[in-house]
Amino acid sequence: MKNTDNLLIAKLKELREILNDSEDKDAAIRELHSIYDTVIEDHKKNVLDKWYDFAKEKRMDVFAIGDEIKLCKSREEDRDSYIKLQKENAIMPRAFEMDGFEDLLWGEACDEKVFCVSVRRKTDDVYMGYCSIKNIQKDDLELAVELLKEFHGHGYGRQALTLFLISIKEYAGIDSFKALVDGENISSQKMCEACGGKPSGIAEYLLHDKEYMEKYEQENQNEITDQMREIAKKFSVSPEKLLTHVLVYRFKI
């Protein structure tokens, strides 16, 4: 998410500068802990006492079949392609140099709280990406769709998301979802709208430091484009908010 990635990178750079000043090192460490705790708490918010566990769907080798793609149970052989996909979208590529980081990413994709299916091409079974519900234990189910760059621009994302939503409703009876999209990610916005997603305001993403975010918005006014102004109007928010927030699309199938 380009805008919010830039926000988080700016915050981390600021903390790195503080860490270089020994007098403020403790304050920076506390701030880093705060950011980490916020990410963890985001995963814990609004968790239901009971939820649909998708146990039946997770056991299905083939979840759904479309005209050009199929949605399948994740396979161990998908791991390398999934990691490649994460590298293509990484804001901190050096993290992949850390021991165990790739295992952590793959483990998160296969976690019991996630319902994730691989998107595969029908003709040759090639891995293209994935569709998922990020946390099935939440009361507000968030969608995620990512495809390898080589498959961008062919309508596969729209096909995959449509098939995913229709199939979930058919099997589980669930028909309400949301998706978070960066204000500069026009292709994902078009995909959401083509699949029936409706603009529904904005949301904070990872960083929740309101004072810092307001300062960032003021200092980066020059980053606001005419296109961002049009998008902000569609979502009924001030353009500068797209520098620090993500767009929310809601789906009712």
Segments and roles (model prediction):
Residues 115-121:
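Cytosolic beta-strand hydrophobic patch enriched in CBS
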Residues 73, 108-109:
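Short secondary-structure boundary/capping segments within folded domains
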Residues 19-22:
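Secondary-structure edge/capping motif, primarily at the C-terminal ends of alpha-helices
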Residues 2-17, 30, 34-80, 85, ...:
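Acyl-donor (CoA/ACP) binding surface of acyl/acetyltransferases
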